[in-house]
Structure formats: C-alpha cells, structure tokens
Regions:
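Short, flexible beta-strand-to-coil junctions
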Residues: 65-66, 111-117, 148-151
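Surface-exposed interaction regions enriched in Ser/Thr/Asp/Glu
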Residues: 91-101, 147-159
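Short, intrinsically disordered N-terminal pre-domain segments
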Residues: 1-22, 31-32, 155-160
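Beta-rich globular "head" domains
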Residues: 23-28, 50, 56, 102-114, ...
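Small/polar beta-strand repeat architecture
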Residues: 30-54, 63-103
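Short, surface-exposed beta-strand/strand-loop-strand elements in extracellular ectodomains
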Residues: 115-124, 155-159
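Beta-sandwich interaction modules
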Residues: 130-144
C-alpha cells in the first residue's frame, strides 16, 4: 500500500498573507518571482521575464515582497509588462512574487505570528473581526481574505 505525503487533516501549503480589503488570499503556488527592472505607474515591468510564456493572466496576484504590498493583474501590456490594480512598484529593484488568483476562493486556516486583531472574510462571505488574537495562534475558521482595515496582527500565514 502506498502512502501519500499529504494527510487529510493537515495543511500541505502555506503562503504569507498581505492583508487587503479587496484581494483574496491567492492560490499558494508561485507562478514567477524576480525583481522589477523599470517603473511606471500601476505597472510591473521586468525585462528578464516573459509573462505570456509564464502564463501570467488577468486576476493573478502580485506581491511586492520588498514593501509588503499587493495588487492584481488587470491586463498584460506586453511580454515584459503587466498593468496592475494599484501602484505598488515606485522604485527598482523590488522583489516580487506572482501567484494564481483566487476569485472563487479556497478556504484557508490562519496562523498569526504577532498578536492583534484580525479582520477576515470567511469562506461564507461573512466579515468577522477576531479581537486580541495572541502570538503564535491558529485561527480555526475557513477564510478567503484577511482585510487590511481592522487588522493589527502581523506575520500572518494562510494554510491550505
């Protein structure tokens, strides 16, 4: 009998959470990671990557890892430039990661590294503010998004 490395009651994937009032936690699979090579308002420009070949598409989620900011891809401008929902690249080089979007969200459990309040959108599309979540806490609620407004906790990781 063959045994899988995955167990049904444990998380198999984890992703750092950048809180947003509009963007769901993305699928925890990196499409591409690199550094931007130029700056233009509301764009990600990387002359070293071919976003078409990599399969980056509208709705994918971009993390500016350097600054801890987030945006979605609204369109491809060219093979090396993406139009974004927010101006998250104002200098170079900034490290970024692109993840598959999560429009019909998977449900994630959360780990909170540093204490505070956590404002979430549950998988049932209900907003909830969890008050005074302690350091190193797991939140046993299925969530699709961690909202920026109302969240004071940090070092949050989504588990799938």
């Amino acid at each position: 009998m063959s045994m899988s490395n995955f167990t049904s009651n444990q998380a198999s994937y984890a992703i750092d959470v950048i809180p947003s009032d509009t963007i769901n936690i993305p699928q925890p699979y990196i499409v591409v990671s690199s550094n931007n090579t130029a700056v233009s308002a509301d764009e990600l420009i990387d002359g070293t990557k071919d976003f078409v070949e990599l399969g980056v598409s509208q709705g994918d989620v971009v993390y500016n890892v350097t600054d801890g900011t987030i945006a979605t891809v609204t369109s491809r401008i060219s093979t090396t430039a993406l139009k974004l929902s927010a101006n998250i690249f104002t200098a170079t080089p900034k490290s970024y990661e692109i993840y598959q979007g999560n429009p019909k969200p998977n449900s994630f459990l959360l780990y909170v590294g540093s204490a505070g309040d956590v404002s979430v959108e549950t998988s049932a599309a209900k907003p909830v503010v969890l008050k005074n979540v302690g350091n190193a806490s797991f939140i046993p609620i299925n969530v699709s998004r961690v909202n920026a407004a109302g969240t004071t906790a940090s070092d949050i990781i989504a588990l799938l």
